[in-house]
């Protein structure tokens, strides 16, 4: 009853339902229609009465009453006068809430330009009028006149005239012969007189005629804006404002502070300036003031309105009284504190609390401990309701009193309320979806929340003072979702890689590891036990220890569920662990009959989950945790300083290394080696010494010692156990404690030559301590930067991928990606099985030997299939991928494959984009921030030999080899590869071999694993001859193109080609070597060209003129120094660079066509290379390559499409353009994975593919056809396909386009939803663009829906939307049916009527 009475007084308007939001430019009429009255005075409120001034910025007559149902003068009070307008003060009697909704307006005495359309680049007004921004500003800010109507004079339209020129023109032609205006009126006139249709038609004609690229772009931009205006129905002159809207006063409040001062919103100041200047201008115009004064006032009005809309966009920033810039309307929307991100995307939550967390080892996995005090506060409304229902209280007030007194019945009721009512726990920063999980609360004393130890990994929590927030899901639906989807027991697997995330860590691992140790010569060795009872008995009587080698019977079940048992060689500790394994035929005792390191425990849990299901796994994990803690406690493993053993041989190794460094010093002083070489050698020597000491130390720690008295094995070294089990600590940390700290880096990243010889146990000397401070400081600064950078990367990723949702089951795509194992330096880093697990096969996967089908096309690859695939040695598999999915909005379930967090095929409505973004962003903080400098470091980057990674037979692809004078096989081909085939003839490995490598094997040889196949010099690129003959030099003139340089240290001279273009005399030389026969004729090469070898700068000549050379002999070498010292961008910056699709600094140049290399005429300091195609229909392609870049092609070399002309990191755009989408995908996936793999982070490929899909959504129109697009437009790929299908049906000409790769920021800003783009970055620009085009946001993605406050169209929200759609459709059908039936009834009635009349 009370509810209904309340509603009478406070009618709640029903929430509006809508499907889309449109934004456009407001016309003056529109602004007037919003307004409730004009604001004429700058006053706000009367400082004595605190009542708003009439016609002022807070006027009650315009905006509504200040108190509910009370007019300003107090004549009408209460509900009964609702809607009456007081005749004394003119205020309507209504709710004060209308002061948040009603707008006012200011009539401007002179029009002003809207700064967004003027200054937001590209300037809309400028583009429309085809004038530069500078010129328009000159007119707007009253510096120049502009000719709007030249009449018959010699002036041109849009010509700018200064004051003097205007006067001269008036004198010359007379005032009425032409029109020239100044200020916003002039621009208004120009815009109002534009005939958009005619302009658009003219532009189209010009576009068709123009040939220059630049002009075309300019015309296209203008045409686009003209068309936007035509399509949206906006008028260009609306960009000039004659009326300014004023936002409701309660959105820019004025709050009295104590002491008679006021706190006010900046907007009030800005509006005041506008009103003041406007009123002054009106008065001046009435007084007929001189033009110059009026003009100045108009300019000031323009500036005041500019500041109101976007302060600081033009000219000086307007500051308030306290020298702080005023916050304009634009600033209200922009940035992290703006309306979008602060209030629409991030809202405060009611019913929440936060407290410190402590560990709760006796909790079950689905529980958390909630302090009673907190629970009482959080569940208050529920408690009040229950108290009322049970008759303890009749009013809310009484219930409140009971709760405040904390009466015993309140606690009982709290227990009831809490039972089965899950709460959400959240730990900031929430980097992925496992940062919020649901638990069932259990009440505890104290004030800290208890958290289950196994979920710490997911929350990344520890108990050193972390805090967590608790939220209460209120509605039944929310509770249901929390229980079914977010319960900690439902999140056992990691969404990023599908491995278990509920894995014991630290103490638990240590306990389990200790349980599983096997020791020699323990009491009771060799005993046999029939069941656990006997074993427990023996253990308690100390007949055996946990580590004794025994035989034991392990009981499990077979496939039918009958009990079976088997005897194993094991230890009592392992038997205890085996007891906890679920009884299942697929869970053998072997998985815990091994050393339980963290990796093995994880494997065990995964195995149990895959074979026994979720419930069993949860129970198993809880038990294993209890066991781990119990035994970690019993084992009493602790960290003592004597556990860190310093190896005896340390002093010896250090002395040896010091002797070596002294020797290098001496060699340097004698001039035998350079400074750089000495540095490298010293650093290398110390690096080796550190490693040696570490090895010795680890050997000492690992060593098993026996007690001489009892003969039993002593307990293993505690620290070694901690490290080896994976509980805590690494070899690196142990080395610093017990070995030597080793080499340190300078802040610049270079390595300091003198290492730190001491370790922490011995203590550092002052100098050593000082040297080690650099690295420590850098590490701290790094961490701070890393967090921010990683968060920003995640934000961009989420933004680009938020609308990738699973929207249908199967798109029927017949394209996909080819998966192959990833091999790095001969080692397989990702096997093909790992890569295809949980993906859908595109073609049937066949067994290479028997030909039987392992996986049918369209089926998902499961674990059992992976085993068969790995055994069969399949090397490449075609799979479906999100990248090639053809679903219109979103991705289909078949292309995506398995939902990694559930281990089942993905459900419809799953927001895979956001999950992908989180999976890539979450480990961001673990990546390094640094760029690796490979200048002074000790590692040599380039490997100089190739070893076989498999046994098999050698096959040479594109074989092109010769034997040189030493009798070695030398590779002469640019794109030759060594293949190793297995017995069945399948490729096991493919290795590219570089030009000039020496081969140790030939076609058909068999190789063993680890056998050398080829070697080459990593520091020089050879130039070799492929014909035998006599060398002759061309254009190698001493002093001009060749100089003899003597090596200072060794005194050996070498002849080097120098830059001959630096002197005017040498400008047209082409230094080369030619090979001639005895008669002096130039020999021909196999490809038909002359045997002439052009030499580049810095080549070292290896032969003298007239020397006799054999095929395969080196005639010149090109040192590769420049390539060696490049910085490798690693870690986070590299990932960001790849996702942003930036071109690397020195990027590779890739051949676009197959053909022959020719050298063209050189450019200033660039080399021109032309590729002449093999196919005559294609144009030759030219490339310009900077001189001095190491460059290995010769005139006449044959090159294939996709080969590198110049080495380096390729630009992703080039890969896409030349090799296509699949090559690009595999490049990006592999490059990104490499960065994460270095840090040991596992991420499934499909997440990266989802992001890359979002980057490849657009195509650039090349042929517009009848699509209505302009070449160069970016259009959605699928949209273009749909338009083309329609055009082909109508018999018109379809358009075509090339796929373009957009970086994630660009792609986010190009989403079809302007709301989503505006909330991401560059808010003003996005909104300006959207308003001009009159864009419609159909609210398809997640972000837009959050902003307008609807359920997101993913997950349960997606289902709700679907059900709603079905219901609406059904309603319409029912209504139609009713209409039909009622319609026929009416017709019958009319018939009856007519017959009656006829009868009368």
UniProtKB/Swiss-Prot annotation:
What EC number(s) would the UniProt record show? Answer: 2.7.7.6
Q: Superkingdom of the source? A: Bacteria
Which residues does Zn(2+) 2 bind?
811, 885, 892, 895
CDD domains tied to this protein: RNAP_beta'_C (cd02655), RNAP_beta'_N (cd01609)
User: Can you list the GO cellular component terms from the UniProt entry?
Assistant: DNA-directed RNA polymerase complex
What does the Swiss-Prot or TrEMBL cofactor note state?
Binds 1 Mg(2+) ion per subunit.
| Quaternary context | The RNAP catalytic core consists of 2 alpha, 1 beta, 1 beta' and 1 omega subunit. When a sigma factor is associated with the core the holoenzyme is formed, which can initiate transcription.
What family is this protein classified in? Answer: Belongs to the RNA polymerase beta' chain family.
- What is the protein name stated in its UniProt record? DNA-directed RNA polymerase subunit beta'
State the organism of origin: Brucella melitensis biotype 2 (strain ATCC 23457)
Name of the gene encoding the protein in the UniProt record: rpoC
């Amino acid at each position: 009853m009370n509810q209904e009475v309340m509603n009478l007084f406070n009618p709640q308007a029903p929430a509006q339902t809508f499907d889309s939001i449109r934004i456009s430019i407001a016309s003056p009429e529109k602004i007037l229609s919003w307004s409730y009255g004009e604001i004429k005075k700058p006053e706000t409120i009367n400082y004595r009465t605190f009542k708003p001034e009439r016609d002022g910025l807070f006027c009650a007559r315009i905006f509504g009453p200040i108190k509910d149902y009370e007019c300003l003068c107090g004549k009408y009070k209460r509900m009964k006068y609702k809607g009456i307008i007081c005749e004394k003060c003119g205020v309507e009697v209504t709710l004060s809430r209308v002061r948040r909704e009603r707008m006012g307006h200011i009539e401007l005495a002179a029009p002003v330009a809207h700064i967004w359309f003027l200054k937001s680049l590209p300037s809309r007004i400028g583009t429309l009028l085809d004038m530069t921004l500078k010129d328009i500003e000159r007119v707007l800010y009253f510096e120049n006149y502009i000719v709007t109507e030249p009449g018959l004079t010699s002036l041109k339209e849009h010509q700018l005239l200064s004051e003097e020129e205007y006067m001269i023109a008036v004198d010359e032609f007379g005032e009425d012969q032409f029109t020239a205006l100044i200020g916003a009126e002039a621009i208004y006139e120009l815009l109002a007189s534009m005939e958009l249709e005619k302009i658009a038609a003219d532009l189209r004609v010009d576009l068709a005629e123009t040939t220059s690229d630049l002009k075309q772009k300019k015309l296209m931009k203008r045409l686009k804006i003209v068309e936007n205006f035509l399509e949206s129905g906006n008028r260009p002159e609306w960009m000039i404002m004659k009326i300014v809207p004023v936002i409701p006063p309660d959105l820019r409040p004025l709050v009295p502070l104590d002491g008679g001062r006021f706190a006010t919103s900046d907007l009030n100041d800005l509006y005041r300036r506008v009103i003041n200047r406007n009123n002054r201008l009106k008065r001046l115009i009435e007084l007929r003031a001189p033009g110059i004064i009026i003009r100045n006032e108009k300019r000031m009005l323009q500036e005041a309105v500019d500041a109101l809309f976007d302060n600081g966009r033009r000219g000086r920033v307007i500051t308030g009284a306290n020298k702080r810039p005023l916050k304009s309307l634009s600033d209200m929307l922009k940035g992290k504190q703006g309306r979008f991100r602060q209030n629409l995307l991030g809202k405060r939550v009611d019913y929440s609390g936060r407290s410190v967390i402590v560990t709760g080892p006796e909790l079950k996995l689905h529980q958390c401990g909630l302090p009673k005090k907190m629970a009482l506060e959080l569940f208050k409304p529920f408690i009040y309701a229950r108290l009322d229902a049970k008759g303890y209280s009749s009013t809310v007030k009484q219930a409140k009193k009971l709760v405040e007194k904390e009466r015993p019945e309140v606690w009982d009721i709290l227990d009831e309320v809490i039972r089965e009512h899950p709460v959400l726990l959240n730990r900031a920063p929430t980097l992925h979806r496992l940062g919020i999980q649901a638990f069932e609360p259990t009440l505890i004393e104290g004030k800290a929340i208890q958290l289950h130890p196994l979920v710490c990994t997911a929350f990344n929590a520890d108990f050193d003072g972390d805090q967590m927030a608790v939220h209460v899901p209120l509605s039944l639906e929310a509770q249901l979702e929390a229980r079914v989807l977010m319960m900690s027991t439902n999140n056992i697997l990691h969404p990023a890689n599908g491995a278990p995330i509920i894995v014991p860590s630290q103490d638990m691992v240590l306990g389990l590891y200790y349980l599983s140790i096997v020791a020699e010569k323990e009491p009771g060795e060799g005993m046999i036990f029939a069941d656990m009872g006997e074993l427990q008995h023996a253990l308690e009587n100390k007949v055996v220890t946990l580590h004794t080698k025994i035989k034991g019977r392990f009981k499990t079940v077979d496939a039918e569920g009958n009990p079976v048992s088997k005897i194993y060689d094991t230890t009592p500790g392992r038997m205890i662990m085996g007891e906890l394994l679920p009884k299942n035929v697929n869970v053998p005792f072997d998985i815990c009959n091994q050393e339980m390191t963290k990796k093995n425990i994880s494997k065990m849990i995964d195995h149990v989950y895959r074979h026994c299901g979720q419930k069993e796994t949860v129970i198993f994990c809880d038990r294993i945790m209890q066991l781990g803690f119990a035994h970690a406690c019993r084992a009493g493993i602790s960290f003592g300083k004597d556990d860190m053993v310093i190896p005896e041989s340390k002093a010896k190794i250090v002395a040896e290394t010091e002797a070596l460094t002294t020797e290098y010093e001496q060699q340097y002083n004698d001039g035998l080696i350079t400074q750089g070489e000495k540095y490298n050698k010293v650093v290398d020597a110390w690096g080796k010494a550190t490693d040696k000491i570490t090895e010795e130390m680890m050997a000492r720690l690992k060593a098993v010692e026996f007690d001489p008295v009892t003969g039993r094995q002593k307990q293993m070294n505690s620290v070694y156990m901690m490290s080896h089990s994976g509980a805590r600590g690494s070899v690196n940390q142990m080395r610093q404690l017990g070995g030597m700290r080793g080499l340190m880096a300078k802040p610049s990243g270079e390595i300091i030559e003198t290492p730190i010889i001491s370790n922490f146990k011995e203590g550092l000397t002052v100098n050593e301590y000082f040297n080690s401070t650099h690295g420590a400081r850098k590490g701290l600064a790094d961490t701070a930067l890393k967090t921010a950078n990683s968060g920003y990367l995640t934000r961009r990723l989420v933004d680009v991928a938020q609308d990738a949702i699973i929207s249908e089951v199967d798109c029927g795509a017949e394209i996909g990606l080819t998966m192959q194992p990833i091999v790095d330096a001969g080692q397989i880093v990702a096997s093909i099985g790992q890569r295809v697990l949980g993906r859908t096969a595109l073609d049937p996967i066949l067994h290479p030997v028997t030909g039987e089908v392992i996986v049918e096309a369209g089926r998902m690859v499961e674990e059992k299939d992976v085993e068969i695939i790995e055994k069969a040695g399949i090397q490449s598999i075609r799979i479906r991928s999100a990248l090639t999915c053809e679903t219109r909005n979103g991705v289909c379930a078949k292309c995506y494959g398995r939902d990694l967090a559930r281990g089942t095929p993905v459900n419809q409505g799953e927001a895979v984009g956001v999950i992908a973004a989180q999976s890539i962003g979450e480990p961001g903080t673990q990546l390094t921030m640094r760029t690796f400098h490979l200048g002074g470091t000790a590692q040599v980057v380039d490997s100089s030999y190739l070893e076989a990674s498999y046994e098999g037979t050698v096959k040479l692809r594109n074989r092109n080899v010769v034997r040189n004078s030493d009798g070695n096989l030398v590779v002469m081909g640019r794109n030759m590869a060594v293949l190793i085939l297995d017995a069945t003839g399948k490729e096991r490995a493919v290795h590219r071999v570089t030009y000039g490598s020496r081969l140790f094997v030939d076609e058909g040889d068999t190789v063993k694993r680890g056998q050398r196949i080829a070697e080459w010099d990593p520091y020089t690129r050879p130039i070799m001859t492929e014909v035998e003959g006599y060398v002759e030099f061309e254009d190698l003139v001493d002093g001009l193109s060749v100089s003899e340089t003597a090596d200072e240290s060794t005194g050996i001279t070498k002849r080097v080609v120098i830059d001959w273009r630096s002197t005017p005399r040498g400008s047209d030389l082409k230094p080369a070597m030619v090979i001639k026969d005895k008669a002096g004729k130039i020999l021909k090469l196999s490809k038909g060209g002359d045997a002439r070898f052009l030499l580049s700068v810095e080549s070292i000549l290896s032969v003298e003129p007239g020397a006799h050379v054999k095929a395969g002999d080196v005639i010149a070498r090109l040192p590769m120094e420049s390539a060696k010292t490049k910085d490798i961008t690693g870690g986070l910056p590299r990932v960001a660079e790849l996702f942003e699709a930036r071109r690397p600094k020195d990027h590779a140049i890739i051949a676009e066509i197959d053909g022959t290399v020719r050298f063209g005429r050189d450019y200033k300091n660039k080399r021109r290379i032309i590729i002449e195609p093999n196919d005559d229909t294609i144009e030759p392609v030219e490339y310009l390559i900077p001189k001095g870049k190491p460059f290995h092609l010769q005139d006449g070399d044959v090159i294939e499409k996709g080969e590198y002309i110049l080495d380096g990191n390729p630009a992703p755009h080039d890969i896409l353009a030349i090799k296509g989408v699949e090559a690009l995908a595999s490049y990006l996936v592999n490059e990104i994975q490499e960065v994460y793999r270095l840090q040991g982070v596992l991420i499934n490929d499909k997440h990266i593919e989802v992001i890359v899909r979002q980057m490849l959504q657009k195509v650039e129109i090349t042929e517009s056809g009848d699509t209505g697009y302009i070449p160069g437009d970016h259009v959605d790929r699928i949209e273009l396909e749909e338009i083309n299908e329609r055009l082909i049906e109508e018999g018109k000409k379809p358009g075509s386009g090339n796929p373009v790769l957009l970086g994630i920021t660009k792609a986010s800003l190009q989403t079809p939803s302007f709301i989503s783009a505006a909330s991401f970055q560059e808010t003003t620009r996005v909104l300006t663009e959207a308003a001009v085009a009159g864009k419609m946001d159909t609210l398809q993605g997640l972000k837009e829906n959050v902003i307008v406050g609807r359920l997101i169209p993913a997950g349960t929200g997606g289902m709700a939307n679907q059900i709603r759609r079905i219901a609406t459709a059904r309603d319409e059908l029912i209504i139609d049916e009713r209409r039909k039936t009622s319609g026929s009834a009416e017709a019958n009635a009319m018939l009856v009527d007519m017959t009656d009349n006829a009868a009368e």
